[in-house]
C-alpha cells in the first residue's frame, strides 16, 4: 500500500500478518481464487482469509461452522465467513499488536470555518434579495398610498368618515348581541 496515513499502514500490516498466520496454520492448501491486481492489499488479505479453512485450536467448540466476522475500515466492509470465536479473538490480537499500543483514536479536526461559511452564505443571500425588486407586500403598500394621493380631497374625507363609521358599527354590533 502506498498510503501515508499511519493508521492505514498499521491496518495493512495487521492484515498481512493475519494472512501469513492463516496460510501457515492451514493444513490444506488455499483454494482462494486468484486475486485481481487492481485489488488493494486489504481486500486481498481478506479474500485469502475468507477462503482459507477454519483453524480449530484444541479445546474450542465449533458451532455449525462458525459465524461471520465483519471488519469495517476506510469505507470498506470485509466479511469473513466461518469464523470461530477463537479465530476472531486471534484477529483482534493481531490488529491490536499491529496498532502499536492501541492508543486512543485521533479526533477529527474541528470544523472551525463552519460559522464563517454560514455567515458568507447569508451575506450572499441578502445581497441577492436586495438586488431584486421590492417585495410584493411593499409594492402593494406603495400602490395603495399612491391611489389615496390621486383621489380628490372630497373623496378622501368621505373615505375617512366611512372608516370611522366601520369602527362604530363594530361597537354597535357587539352591543346588539349583548341584549
Curated annotation (Swiss-Prot):
User: Which UniProt keyword terms apply here?
Assistant: Jasmonic acid signaling pathway, Nucleus, Stress response, Transcription, Transcription regulation, Ubl conjugation
Chain ranges of the Tify domain: 62-97
Q: What is its main location?
A: nucleus
Q: Where is this motif: Nuclear localization signal?
A: 117-124
Q: How is it modified after translation?
A: Ubiquitinated. Targeted for degradation by the SCF(COI1) E3 ubiquitin ligase-proteasome pathway during jasmonate signaling.
InterPro entries per record: CCT_CS, TIFY/JAZ, Tify_dom
Annotated localization: Nucleus
Write out the residue ranges of the motif Jas: 115-140
CC per GO annotation: nucleus
PROSITE patterns, per the entry: TIFY
> What biological process terms from GO does the record include?
regulation of defense response; regulation of jasmonic acid mediated signaling pathway; response to wounding
Domain comment, as recorded:
The jas domain (115-140) is required for interaction with COI1.
What quaternary arrangement does the UniProt entry report? Interacts with BHLH148. Interacts with COI1A and COI1B in a coronatine-dependent manner. Coronatine is an analog of jasmonoyl isoleucine (JA-Ile).
Which family, according to UniProt? Belongs to the TIFY/JAZ family.
Q: What role does it play? A: Repressor of jasmonate responses. Involved in tolerance to salt and dehydration stresses.
The molecule here is called Protein TIFY 11a
Say which species the protein is native to. Oryza sativa subsp. indica (Rice)
Amino acid at each position: 500500500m502506498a498510503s501515508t496515513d499511519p493508521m492505514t499502514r498499521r491496518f495493512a500490516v495487521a492484515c498481512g500478518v493475519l494472512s501469513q498466520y492463516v496460510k501457515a496454520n492451514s493444513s490444506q492448501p488455499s483454494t482462494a481464487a486468484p486475486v485481481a491486481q487492481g485489488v488493494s492489499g486489504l481486500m486481498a488479505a481478506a479474500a485469502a482469509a475468507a477462503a482459507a479453512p477454519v483453524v480449530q485450536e484444541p479445546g474450542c467448540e465449533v458451532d455449525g461452522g462458525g459465524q461471520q466476522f465483519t471488519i469495517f475500515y476506510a469505507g470498506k466492509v470485509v466479511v469473513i465467513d466461518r469464523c470461530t470465536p477463537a479465530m476472531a479473538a486471534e484477529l483482534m490480537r493481531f490488529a491490536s499488536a499491529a496498532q502499536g499500543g492501541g492508543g486512543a483514536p485521533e479526533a477529527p479536526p474541528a470544523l472551525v470555518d463552519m460559522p464563517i461559511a454560514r455567515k458568507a452564505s447569508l451575506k450572499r443571500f441578502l445581497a441577492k434579495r436586495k438586488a431584486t425588486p421590492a417585495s410584493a407586500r411593499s409594492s402593494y403598500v406603495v400602490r395603495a398610498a399612491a391611489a389615496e394621493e390621486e383621489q380628490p380631497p372630497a373623496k378622501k374625507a368621505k373615505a375617512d368618515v366611512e372608516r370611522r363609521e366601520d369602527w362604530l358599527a363594530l361597537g354597535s354590533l357587539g352591543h346588539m348581541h349583548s341584549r
